[in-house]
């Protein structure tokens, strides 16, 4: 079963992206994505929606 999660910028705390992940995976997602508020690529970590 897949659950919906948000991706939050580690630098500014802005939630920029939403995605899904497999519920059985316990590790938090950590992806390098573009943040329009910071105007650069930063790491984004998983948060609850």
Curated annotation (Swiss-Prot):
Pfam families in alphabetical order: Ribosomal_L33
Gene3D superfamilies with a match to the protein in the record: Ribosomal protein L33 (2.20.28.120)
Alphabetized SUPFAM superfamilies for the sequence: Zn-binding ribosomal proteins
Gene Ontology CC terms: cytoplasm; ribonucleoprotein complex; ribosome
Top-level division of the source organism's lineage: Bacteria
Gene Ontology BP, a term: translation
One annotated GO molecular function: structural constituent of ribosome
Record keywords: Ribonucleoprotein, Ribosomal protein
Signal peptide: none
Family the UniProt entry places it in: Belongs to the bacterial ribosomal protein bL33 family.
Protein name in UniProt: Large ribosomal subunit protein bL33
